[in-house]
């Protein structure tokens, strides 16, 4: 599994002015003899953006070359794939913690707003619930949250409770596409995103509709989610980083409405708050006033263990961990007023700079833990794997080939 060479050629190209210096510092403090190179092909170890990794070299050299990302993992990071992963796993493991910790969801597929009715015919249970909502008082309605499958940073997320409200959301997205030559648009990989947080339907196609958790736990009257960092190594050990963040919505919490102007009280993605995020919006989980923190941490640990096992054992085409790869995932959780923990989503290449300056030591500690646990052991002659004290094992599996 290891290289006998003392000198390790390292290729770092993270293209993030917040994270990359911390990555390099963690590597230099590893105690290993390193030579930094500009060639991914020549490197023994690649810590770079996904599109900059030479995966051919990773495949050809499973014992001597390591990289910071799995090649295939959409069973976890695509929203509708994650939902399928969970329901497939629960069919065989109905007693899993995932049965109560993943909000019920429905998948919609459409190219244009005019095809919503056809898509709802497939999701007939959702359609029935939305029709029932139309006859209820606003206080009695079940609310839903619409999430474009391939978008991140909260792009395109909306709240709704009826078919009419959902149709209006998709109509507004279609309007954005027709006005794209006049409006300012930004390219996000293969996805075009408007600066007003709208998206172009035809470039997305797949959407996930989740039941909205209507009674979230609040901090200072503001909704928040927990950002946990997860390290997956080889095939397959999964660790939860002990230091977690609470990311707070900009505005005080209000009851759900379809008004997009009130989204800032419901969406706790701090990236929506611009470059000058208030430090009060980003907090160290362990230093908050949240009760039952140990129980919440344990629930998160168990959820992570089961969801990675679900992907690894039921989605062999869409999650293929390799022994000479590791990856850091940003996993988001919501806690309700009864301390029930819900899994929201799994993110590849999480936006570390959301942590900000005041809590940057958390990211520094994370990278140090990754170096100690995922990188140094790979290049050591000993088969013993060191595990940093800031990591807690969530799941260990032995996977060989396709499942």
Curated annotation (Swiss-Prot):
Enzyme class name: ligase
Catalyzed reaction equations: C-terminal L-alpha-aminoacyl-L-glutamyl-L-glutamyl-[tubulin] + L-tyrosine + ATP = C-terminal L-alpha-aminoacyl-L-glutamyl-L-glutamyl-L-tyrosyl-[tubulin] + ADP + phosphate + H(+)
Domain (TTL) spans 9-386
Q: Where in the cell is it found?
A: Cytoplasm; Nucleus
Chief site of localization: cytoplasm
EC no. given is 6.3.2.25
Its Gene Ontology cellular component terms are:
cytosol; nucleus; P-body
Keyword Cytoplasm appears in the UniProt entry:
yes
Which family does the similarity line name? Belongs to the tubulin--tyrosine ligase family.
Instruction: Write out the function statement from the record.
Output: Probable tubulin--tyrosine ligase.
**Annotated protein name in UniProt:** Probable tubulin--tyrosine ligase C12B10.04
What is the species listed in this Swiss-Prot or TrEMBL entry? Schizosaccharomyces pombe (strain 972 / ATCC 24843) (Fission yeast)
